């Protein structure tokens, strides 16, 4: 008999709506013992079967659902089916957009909670973020090796969230050849170098692909400020869009060095690109005090909020930084501003921008809205999957 997680009375509603998480407060009891990440059956208070998922005793998310089908076992064949289903969409997208790199698995939205897989050319970069994902590591890798024999697999499960579920951080080659120090990929006509070994997340922010492309329509003959520039994807796109100058700002000299290489790799005019190592908040104030002005500002900061207790402070941070950006824009200038914080809703983010404009003493029009690229889908029953949001704003 399988181990069962029994829900408290009335707490089955989210599972009946096929939400993939069971929170600790919804659990009445466990029937049997399960190890960290082990597959369990989830039943309602009367014992009716609801789902099969992975058990995580140390997490507020006590179980993550693998399947709502009682006949489905969690094995190599299960992972193969999920991977093949996800690949169909990415194949179409890659052909349409001319991509050699994309998100292959977007966790819960692809039916594989806690699993992120990005493909960069012939390298699969894997992140296992939950106890259940780690427990199924061998089955997942076996399925990947069968379906993608041409690809090396590299593990980037070196993220702090693993500690919350009682797991060690892991990183390194799983199978195949070691990735080069910098791997060239292609995106909307750009060549970009990514660092699989040490880069942010899995190496690169694939989720901003379409936003980088959209930037080009606003930048012709314009002076652009690219804040939190990382390795310069927005800068390269701005130069391809015909900007007169782009200033990229980041605290990492290593990232700025790669950004410079990316400009050179695309045979763009390096004299139009400036790279500044500095704190963005500090530099924006310096620019304001000096009377500097820009026509377009890209504001793509890291996540400001990890949990609900940090949300108020994050709102202040987003408002301050966008207020400074609005103050630096010429009349008719464009602010492209983003938040990758899952707890920051699109409505709240829009209100923050409006408040920032009021504090800056400027009127702002919202003219375009952004979200994560199409290889980062959001399944309808898991709205938390929509974490990236952004706006193009025209400053009056």
Swiss-Prot record:
Alphabetized GO MF terms: RNA binding; rRNA (cytosine) methyltransferase activity
Residues annotated as signal peptide: none
Record's keyword annotation contains Zinc: no
Catalytic activity of the protein: cytidine(1962) in 23S rRNA + S-adenosyl-L-methionine = 5-methylcytidine(1962) in 23S rRNA + S-adenosyl-L-homocysteine + H(+)
Subcellular localization: Cytoplasm
Enzyme class at the top of the EC tree: transferase
Stated role: Specifically methylates the cytosine at position 1962 (m5C1962) of 23S rRNA.
Stated family: Belongs to the methyltransferase superfamily. RlmI family.
UniProt protein name: Ribosomal RNA large subunit methyltransferase I
Organism expressing this protein natively: Shigella flexneri serotype 5b (strain 8401)
Name of encoding gene: rlmI
């Amino acid at each position: 008999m399988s181990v069962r997680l029994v829900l408290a009375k009335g707490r089955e509603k989210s599972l009946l709506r096929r939400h993939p998480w069971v929170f600790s407060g919804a659990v009445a009891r466990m029937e049997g013992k399960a190890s960290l990440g082990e597959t369990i059956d989830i039943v309602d208070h009367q014992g009716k079967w609801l789902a099969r998922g992975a058990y995580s005793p140390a997490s507020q998310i006590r179980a993550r659902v693998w399947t709502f089908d009682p006949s489905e076992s969690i094995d190599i064949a299960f992972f193969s089916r999920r991977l093949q289903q996800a690949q169909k969409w990415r194949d179409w997208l890659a052909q349409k957009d001319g991509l050699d790199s994309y998100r292959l698995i977007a966790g819960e939205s692809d039916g594989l909670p806690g699993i992120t897989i990005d493909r960069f050319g012939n390298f699969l970069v894997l992140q296992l973020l939950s106890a259940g994902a780690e427990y199924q590591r061998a089955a997942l890798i076996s399925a990947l090796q069968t379906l993608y024999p041409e690809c090396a697999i590299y593990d980037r499960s070196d993220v702090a969230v693993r500690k919350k579920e009682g797991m060690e951080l892991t990183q390194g080659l799983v199978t195949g050849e070691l990735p080069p120090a910098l791997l060239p990929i292609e995106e909307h006509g750009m060549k970009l170098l990514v660092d699989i070994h040490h880069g942010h997340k899995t190496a690169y922010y694939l989720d901003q692909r379409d936003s980088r492309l959209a930037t080009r329509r606003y930048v012709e003959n314009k002076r652009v400020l690219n804040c939190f520039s990382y390795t310069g994807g927005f800068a390269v796109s701005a130069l391809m869009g015909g900007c007169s100058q782009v200033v990229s700002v980041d605290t990492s000299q290593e990232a700025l060095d790669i950004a410079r290489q990316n400009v050179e790799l695309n045979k763009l005019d390096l004299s139009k690109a400036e790279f500044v190592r500095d704190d963005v908040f500090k530099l924006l104030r310096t620019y304001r005090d000096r009377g500097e002005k820009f026509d377009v500002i890209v504001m793509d900061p890291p996540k400001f909020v990890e949990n609900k207790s940090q949300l108020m402070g994050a709102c202040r941070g987003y408002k301050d930084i966008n207020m400074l950006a609005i103050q630096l824009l010429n009349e008719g200038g464009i602010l492209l501003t983003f938040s990758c914080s899952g707890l920051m809703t699109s409505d709240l983010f829009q209100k923050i921008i409006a408040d920032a404009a009021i504090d800056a003493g400027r009127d702002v029009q919202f003219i375009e809205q952004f979200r994560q690229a199409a290889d980062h889908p959001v399944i309808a029953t898991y709205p938390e999957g929509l974490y990236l949001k952004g706006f193009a704003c025209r400053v009056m």
